[in-house]
Structure formats: structure tokens, C-alpha cells
């Protein structure tokens, strides 16, 4: 419960409310896009590679993208300027540390 409150508080610090989050699928390749125009750095971690941090790429509109993900089930979260961020995702799953991760389910 306390960890959940901390995550909610961090969301407020990052941008006032949860950033918009979009999933795009092209030819079975998944791209996740996070709208966080004021962020300096965004990293992505997923269960695909044991939550190894990988940098997201920022475009001119402040959207951060992580491309080339397989269209398979996985859990994930972002680090925005060093702070854990769960966007407003459709599915969430409890992690092993008392918090939660977003969960992607193939379409």
C-alpha cells in the first residue's frame, strides 16, 4: 500500500498526471510510446530481457519510443529522470517487490 502511494506521488512529480501511453504494432513488431515532453531521460525495462534498462528515443514532440519489441506477453515499466513510472496501462501485474508493472498482452 505504501509503495503504491509512493508510485502515485512520483507520477505527480514527473508531470502532474500520468503521461499518455500508446502501443503501436506493425508487422508483429511492438513500439511503445510515452508522452513525457519535460523528461530529460527515459529508460524502459521489461521482462523480455530480465528488466535490463534500455534507453527510449525522444522525438521533437516530446514522445519517447521503444521499438522492436516482439508481439509477445511481457511486463514493463519506465524510469523517467531516474524515477519509476507506470503509465496509464490497460493491464497491471503485481511484481515481486510489492508494487506492480504494466503488462502487455499480444493482440
Stretch-by-stretch model annotation:
Residues 1-8:
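Sec-dependent signal peptide recognition
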Residues 18-20:
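Bacterial signal peptide processing site
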Residues 23-73, 81-107:
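Aromatic-rich carbohydrate-binding modules that target alpha-glucans
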Residues 13-16:
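C-terminal motif of bacterial Sec signal peptides marking the signal peptidase cleavage site
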Amino acid at each position: 500500500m505504501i509503495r503504491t502511494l509512493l508510485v502515485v506521488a512520483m507520477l505527480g512529480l514527473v508531470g502532474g498526471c500520468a503521461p499518455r501511453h500508446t502501443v503501436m504494432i506493425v508487422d508483429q513488431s511492438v513500439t511503445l510510446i510515452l508522452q513525457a515532453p519535460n523528461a530529460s531521460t527515459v529508460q524502459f525495462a521489461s521482462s523480455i530481457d530480465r528488466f535490463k534498462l534500455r534507453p527510449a528515443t525522444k522525438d521533437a514532440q516530446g514522445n519517447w519510443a521503444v521499438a522492436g519489441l516482439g508481439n509477445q506477453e511481457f511486463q514493463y515499466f519506465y524510469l523517467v529522470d531516474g524515477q519509476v513510472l507506470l503509465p496509464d496501462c490497460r493491464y497491471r501485474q503485481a511484481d515481486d517487490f510489492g508494487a506492480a508493472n504494466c503488462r502487455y498482452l499480444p493482440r
